[in-house]
Amino acid sequence: MKLSRRSFMKANAVAAAAAAAGLSVPGVARAVVGQQEAIKWDKAPCRFCGTGCGVLVGTQQGRVVACQGDPDAPVNRGLNCIKGYFLPKIMYGKDRLTQPLLRMKNGKYDKEGEFTPITWDQAFDVMEEKFKTALKEKGPESIGMFGSGQWTIWEGYAASKLFKAGFRSNNIDPNARHCMASAVVGFMRTFGMDEPMGCYDDIEQADAFVLWGANMAEMHPILWSRITNRRLSNQDVTVAVLSTYQHRSFELADNGIIFTPQSDLVILNYIANYIIQNNAINQDFFSKHVNLRKGATDIGYGLRPTHPLEKAAKNPGSDASEPMSFEDYKAFVAEYTLEKTAEMTGVPKDQLEQLAQLYADPNKKVISYWTMGFNQHTRGVWANNLVYNLHLLTGKISQPGCGPFSLTGQPSACGTAREVGTFAHRLPADMVVTNEKHRDICEKKWNIPSGTIPAKIGLHAVAQDRALKDGKLNVYWTMCTNNMQAGPNINEERMPGWRDPRNFIIVSDPYPTVSALAADLILPTAMWVEKEGAYGNAERRTQFWRQQVQAPGEAKSDLWQLVQFSRRFKTEEVWPEELLAKKPELRGKTLYEVLYATPEVSKFPVSELAEDQLNDESRELGFYLQKGLFEEYAWFGRGHGHDLAPFDDYHKARGLRWPVVNGKETQWRYSEGNDPYVKAGEGYKFYGKPDGKAVIFALPFEPAAEAPDEEYDLWLSTGRVLEHWHTGSMTRRVPELHRAFPEAVLFIHPLDAKARDLRRGDKVKVVSRRGEVISIVETRGRNRPPQGLVYMPFFDAAQLVNKLTLDATDPLSKETDFKKCAVKLEKV
C-alpha cells in the first residue's frame, strides 16, 4: 500500500512520540520515507513479546527492508520498542538454515555423526522410521513434542490434532509451560476460565498501578510508555513496584519495594488482612459474587519423587480445597500482621502500609500487573490466586481502570498455547483431556473414533526432560523454541536425554541454536512474515498477518512440516483395531486425509486469496489451509465465552478481543454492560464457575525449594533485558542489538563484590549444585540487586545460566521457578 499524506504525518508523529518516550527509531525506519513508491507495506503483529504491538512491514524485491509502528494499531499507537524497529533484520542472519541437516557417518544416520545436508524427503524418511518404530515397540507414550507460544494459532492447532488425535499421544507441551502455566491454573482455580478480564484500555483510566515481579520498562516497554504517560500526566496517579531486586521500572515508582525472595506470598496475605481490619471490603460485591475456600498446603516442589523434598511433602501436588467461612478466612490472614510481614520480607512497615492502602481505598482504581516474578515460582499458582483475592475483596475487578492482569511474554502464549490448548492436559477453549465430555466434543468435531484422544494427561515440559533421560520418551520433536538454553537444569536433566543413543531428537528452527546443535535432525523453518499467521496477545486480542515474503532456500513453515509429515502415516499404523472398527470408512486413509484434508478444513478454495497474495502452504495443497483450520478451531469457543470472529474479519482489523459476539469485541469480561454473557440485572457473573461466583483462597507462605546456605550463599535470579528476547536466537543476529548488549553479565551488589575481592569487569565463576558458568561482574547499570542476590539474563548462548537453575516447579502448574536457587562465586 502507498504512504498517504495522513500516514506520512502519522509516521512523523510517531517519531516525535518515540523520542519523548525514550524509544529509539533507527535509521531503517526513518529512511523509508524517501523510498515509499518502491516499498510495499502491510500490517503484522510484532514477532516478539505478548504485548501484541502492530507494525507496518515494508517489503521490496522479496525481502523485508523496513518496519515501523502502525499508527492505526490500538495497542502501540504507532510506537515500537527498540526490538520492534529492528524486526526486518531478524530473518537475515548469516547463519540462517536453508536445508535439512542430519547427523550422518558413512552415508547414514549416526548419533555421533556430523550434520550433513539432506532433502525433505530424506528427513521425513528418517522421522517416519523413528516414529513408527517407537509407536510399534513402546506405544504413543514413547513419542513427544515440545512446541511454542510463538507458534501461529493454526500451527499449534495442527500440532495438537496430529499428536492428540493422530498419534494418540498427549505428550505435547508448549514452552509457555515455563512462563504462563501458573497464570492459567490461577485463572482456572479462581474464575473457572483462562485469561484476563480486563484490557490495555485500563491504563488510561487507572489511579494506581502495582507491579508484582514485572519489569515492564524492559519487558513490556510499550505498555510501560502508556503507564508512564498516565503517571506523569496525573499527579494523583501512583505506581508501586515490587521485586527482589531494583530494575528500570523503579525509576517511575512512587513506592519501590524490594522483598526477600518467596515472601511476596506474605505481602499478599498481609494486604488481605489490612483490607479486612480496615473495613475496606466491598460488602455488596463480596456477598453476591465470591466464595471462600481453604487450599491444601505442603504440596511439594515438583521435583522427582525420589527427591527428599518430595518425600517430605504431606500433600505433594495436591490441588484440593474445601469451603471455609469468612470468620475462618479472617482468622487465617490475621496471622499476617504488619510486624510479621516486615520481619519476613525485609520491607519497611511504612512501605507495606502505603501499598495496602492503594487496594483498601474505595476511591482508587487499581490495576495489578505481573509476569515471571509471580509465575516462575514454586507457589506461582498461589501467588496468582492471592492477588485475585485483593481485587475480589474490594470489588476492583472487571471494570474500566480496575483489575488483576497477567501479562504474557510470548506473542501467542495466549492465542496458541492457552486458547488452542497445546498443553499436555488441554484441548481448545479451556477443555481438558481428562474430561470425557470434552474429549467427545473434539472427537465428534474432528470425525475420529470415540476414544481416540487419551484420557491420561501427557508429559509436561520438565517431565519430558526426565522421561528422555530415563529412556521412556524416545522420539522428540521441538518446534519454535530453544529449550536446551531456556529450560532449567541443563546438565542433570536435559542434555543427558538429548544425547542418549536410545532417543532421536528433531529440532525445527530458522537458526542453529543451542537446541538445534544438540539434536539429531534439524529442519529449516520459515519465520514471521514468511508465512501467513495469527497470534493472540495478553489482552485477548487475536491478530492476523499475510505472508509477505518467501523463506530462503528449502526453509518451510512449522505448519507445512506438520501437515506434510502427517501424509506418512495411515490410520492402521497409529490406531488400534477397536478404534478403526468404530469408523471403518477411515481405514487406509492417511492422517493428512483424516486431520487436514477434510471437508471441514478444505472447503475454502485458494481462489479466496488475491491473485498476487503469497501463501505457500495453501497454494501447494490446493485449498486455503489456514482459513479451514481456523474456522474449525473457532467453532469450539463460539457460544461458550471464547467467541472468535469470522476469519476474514481479522485480516481487515487491527485485532479483535474475544469474546466477539455479533461483530462486537469485549473489553471487560464478567461485568454487566461490557460482557455479552452477563445478563441485565446480574451485575457481575464469573460464568466459568457453575454458580457464577469467583473464589477467594486461603493459602499460606511456604519456603522456596532451595535457599542460600553457608556454602552457596547467594540467591540467583534469572531473566531478560530490553535489547534481547528470550535466548537471543533472533536478537543477537541483529548487529545493532548485539552491540547494545553483547554478552550476559552478573549483576551484583558492590558490597557483595567487594567481599569476594571482585571488581566490575572481572571474570567470575558462578557455581550451583548443578553446574557452573563463567560471567562478567557488573556492579552498576540497570539492575541493582540487594546484598545477598545476583541476577543474570539468559540470552547469551556462551553463558548457559540454566546450567545453574533447579528444575523445581509449581506442583499445580508444573511451571519452573527460574527466580530462586542458591549459588556461590569464585574469582577466575
From Swiss-Prot:
GO molecular function: 4 iron, 4 sulfur cluster binding; electron transfer activity; iron ion binding; molybdenum ion binding; molybdopterin cofactor binding; nitrate reductase (cytochrome) activity
Binding site for Mo-bis(molybdopterin guanine dinucleotide): 83, 150, 175, 179, 212-219, 243-247, 262-264, 372, 376, 482, 508-509, 531, 558, 718-727, 802, 819
Keywords assigned by UniProt, alphabetized: 4Fe-4S, Electron transport, Iron, Iron-sulfur, Metal-binding, Molybdenum, Nitrate assimilation, Oxidoreductase, Periplasm, Signal, Transport
Principal subcellular localisation of the protein: periplasm
One Pfam short name: Molybdopterin
SMART domains for this protein: Molybdop_Fe4S4
Binding site for [4Fe-4S] cluster: 46, 49, 53, 81
Compartments in which it is found: Periplasm
Names of required cofactors: [4Fe-4S] cluster; Mo-bis(molybdopterin guanine dinucleotide)
Subunit structure comment from the entry: Component of the periplasmic nitrate reductase NapAB complex composed of NapA and NapB.
Family according to the record: Belongs to the prokaryotic molybdopterin-containing oxidoreductase family. NasA/NapA/NarB subfamily.
Protein name: Periplasmic nitrate reductase
Source species of the chain: Escherichia coli O157:H7
